[in-house]
């Protein structure tokens, strides 16, 4: 902890190993700008000495043989950039790497997604008494222990939203997955009322609790999620779904929701929307992490669930 205001230039985080162990690394998928990507990739099975010198996101697993594995994780990431690692080759070392603090940003025209165009020469600005993220080496003797390890959850900050009995977990019917492509139906499939009523009917028949209205229910180029396209009547869809026991989740972009946060939460919660699928963060610098917390606080206050997509690992 530290009481005064600080600018944090960098953090030295090293993980040194005595041998050339096998390692499983998920590399960044963006070779040009490795800090900007969706945090989704297959794992590359290699050794510490043969691993590529490029950024990998967490979790990363080191194989100690005889069934023992160490998984590098992070917990309680708040108001701070997330950690990547990069292999140091023959040194049998993984070096922590952190996104610098954004200096300037711009927006992609198609969906108004914010991206960093210039970075500062430091990683964080912070003030007041605080703690910093946990860095975890979770030891397992069997692979079946890995997915049930609860250290990230156990080391995270306690629940801040109080009563969370309003949160309803469940499955979702997802329009984007098959590009709204319905065959053998007596209407033109697409982002329209007939298509979404069909999805609601499908969800009801198969005990699926939600449907998502993915990209296109508002004009993504506008960056305005308060204005629904004229082909859709959300009030009617919500009522139709309610009568069949199916709730609706709306897709949006992180910074678009953040820019209209209170208005969007109030409007759609009052209408009966149950949550947001929030997409295309593709960053974990300090400002991006702060945005996630703002969104989580506001949506929880309005009893809206969150489905976070295109985001860094859970902490």
Model region roles, listed by residue range:
Residues 24-26, 174-177, 217, 251:
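Tryptophan-centered motif/residue detector
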């Amino acid at each position: 902890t530290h009481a005064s205001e600080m600018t944090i230039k960098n953090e030295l985080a090293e993980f040194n190993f005595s041998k050339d162990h096998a390692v499983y690394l998920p590399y960044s998928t963006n070779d040009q700008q490795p800090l900007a990507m969706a945090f989704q990739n297959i794992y590359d099975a290699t050794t510490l000495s043969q691993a590529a010198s490029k950024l990998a996101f967490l979790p990363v697993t080191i194989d100690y043989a005889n069934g023992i594995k160490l998984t590098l994780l992070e917990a309680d990431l708040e108001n701070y950039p997330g950690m990547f690692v990069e292999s140091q080759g023959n040194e049998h070392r993984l070096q922590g790497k952190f996104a610098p603090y954004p200096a300037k940003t711009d927006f992609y025209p198609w969906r108004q997604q914010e991206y960093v165009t210039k970075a500062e020469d430091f990683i964080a600005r912070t003030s007041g008494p605080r703690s910093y993220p946990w860095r975890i080496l979770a030891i397992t003797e069997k692979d079946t222990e890995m997915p049930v390890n609860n250290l990230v959850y156990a080391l995270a900050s306690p629940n801040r939203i109080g009563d969370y009995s309003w949160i309803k977990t469940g499955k979702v019917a997802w329009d984007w997955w098959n590009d709204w492509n319905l065959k053998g139906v007596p209407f033109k499939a697409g982002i329209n009322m007939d298509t979404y009523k069909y999805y609601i009917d499908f969800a009801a028949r198969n005990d699926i609790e939600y449907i998502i209205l993915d990209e296109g229910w508002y004009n993504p180029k506008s960056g305005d999620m308060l204005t629904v396209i004229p082909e859709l009547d959300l009030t009617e869809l919500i009522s139709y779904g309610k009568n069949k026991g199916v709730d609706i989740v709306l897709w949006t972009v992180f910074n678009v929701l953040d820019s209209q946060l209170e208005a969007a939460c109030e409007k759609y919660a009052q209408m009966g929307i149950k949550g947001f699928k929030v997409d295309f963060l593709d960053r974990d610098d300090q400002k991006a992490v702060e945005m996630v917390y703002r969104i989580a606080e506001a949506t929880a206050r309005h009893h809206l669930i969150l489905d976070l997509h295109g985001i860094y690992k859970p902490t």
